[in-house]
Amino acid sequence: LSSWGFDARVSEGFCPIPALGWTAAHDEGVIGAVMIGASGAPAGYQGVCVRDANGLIAPGEFLARVESLVPGEASDSRGACGSAALLDTYISELERLVDADAISAARPRIVVDPMYGTSRGILAGMLRRLGADVIEIHGDDRTDFAGLHPRPVEPWVDDCEQAVMSSGACAGLVLDGDADRIGLVDEKGRFVSTHRLYALVMGHLVETRGMSGRVAMPLNGSTYV
């Protein structure tokens, strides 16, 4: 990208795709973002995820145009590129949105399973700063993912279910490889899918918090809500 005249920056460390999209949306100097990864696919897979200047998944027609411009062979030319700290501001914003005092007072024990993906150390670290007692599994550096498919679905959440039960945690949080999907394990070791989790959150906001208004949901999860 630098060799083609773009001011390209590379993340200083692991970067969950929500942080990448958030940066693209909130930095007026950014026209788009690219992540190399394979989401929930096994370690042998690789792909490219493109976000537009609004931090959203680029539409198909735009991606088709980009793909048509990709040369058949890689260029030998390389331009200079800088680095960017993408996490600090994003994490600060997340911490601002939650009730830190309530979390600190409750000191919940939570199992976090980043599935060897981009969120390792990040979500666990944030929860610890907020006062939670956190147990992180699958957080070490394994380029082969130890054979795990980093998807928050059965049977790949079995280790988190067992960790919740054995540690007496109140919940487990399971994220996929690029950390844009999350699943929940309850205190009894039962898995709650991403779509059902959306419905639980909506129920809490309406029934407990008394909130009302319009809700936008992906089509694949809207029937639950």
Regions found by a protein language model. Name each.
Residues 36, 112-115, 175-177, 217:
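Active-site flanking residues adjacent to catalytic metal/cofactor-binding acidic residues
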